[in-house]
């Protein structure tokens, strides 16, 4: 007599994408029944004048494709690593100098976007519906707010984050 095969439960997916202050990357990781990608364009601050703070933004887009018939609601959480430096002071290097900056969860620039575990950091959560039907997809976007603090006496030149900041998505 044959035993029925146990049906696997759908695990929570986990995906990692890398983002540097001067470069954006796309990465994907399939879950059992669905696949999601994270797209992160470059966060380019522009010209820094050493007297005033400088802000910039970029948008993280989460896109999931459904492989089954019923409609699905995707809930996700985005966490960022500290990259080089720490959550208190992320760093870009160039021309022999270091320029400190940070990434925030809102335009108010009060809560550092991090892992949600390390003191004072928070993650960003979102959700969206994907209609039923194989190959149907949906997406949601979150804004990353960046700020370079004022009064950093650095030489002119191009600055970038040599070690990428990692974005982890749990869904």
Task: Cite the ranges covered by each PLM segment.
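N-terminal signal peptide c-region/cleavage motif recognized by signal peptidases
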Residues: 28-30
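Substrate-binding/active-site groove segments that recognize
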Residues: 99
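Predominantly extracellular/luminal cell-surface or secreted proteins
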Residues: 79-81, 102-106, 114-116
């Amino acid at each position: 007599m044959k035993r029925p095969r146990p049906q696997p439960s759908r695990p929570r997916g986990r995906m990692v994408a890398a983002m540097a202050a001067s470069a954006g990357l796309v990465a994907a990781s399939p879950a059992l029944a669905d696949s999601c990608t994270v797209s992160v364009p470059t966060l380019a601050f522009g010209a820094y004048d050493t007297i005033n703070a400088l802000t910039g933004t970029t948008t993280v887009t989460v896109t999931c494709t459904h492989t089954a018939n019923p409609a699905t609601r995707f809930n996700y959480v985005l966490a960022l690593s500290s990259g080089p430096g720490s959550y208190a002071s992320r760093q870009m290097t160039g021309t022999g100098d270091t320029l400190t900056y940070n990434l925030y969860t809102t335009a108010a620039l009060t809560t550092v976007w991090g892992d949600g575990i390390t003191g004072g950091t928070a993650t960003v959560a979102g959700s969206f519906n994907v209609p039923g039907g194989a190959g149907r997809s949906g997406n949601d976007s979150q804004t990353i707010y960046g700020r370079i603090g004022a009064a950093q006496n650095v030489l002119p030149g191009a600055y970038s984050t040599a070690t990428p900041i990692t974005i982890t998505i749990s869904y």
